[in-house]
C-alpha cells in the first residue's frame, strides 16, 4: 500500500505486553505524535476491551472512546470515555432517527 510506504511504524513488540487499555493509550499517542497521520490535537481512537466489573465481578465489554477536544498525542486514561458496550448497544431501542440524534447524548452517562 502507498500509505505504508509513507508512514513509519513506531509500534514495538514490547507494547504487546501492555494491558489492552495501555495498548490503546500507546497506540493513540503514537498516532497523535505523527503529524503525517493526524493534525495536532486531532484524531480519534477507540477500542472494545474485556474488563472485570469491580462491582459485579462479571466480565464486561467496555468501549473506550477518545473524548472530544483531547490531544491524541498526549492522551492518558482519563481522556477516554468508557461505555458499557451492552448498555450502549441498547440505545438503539430508543433511537428515533437522524433528526433526534442530539437527544441521545443525554443517555450516554447511563452507559458508563
Stretches found by the model and what they are:
Residues 18-112:
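N-terminal low-complexity or amphipathic/hydrophobic leaders
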Residues 1-23:
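Flexible inter-domain linker/hinge segments
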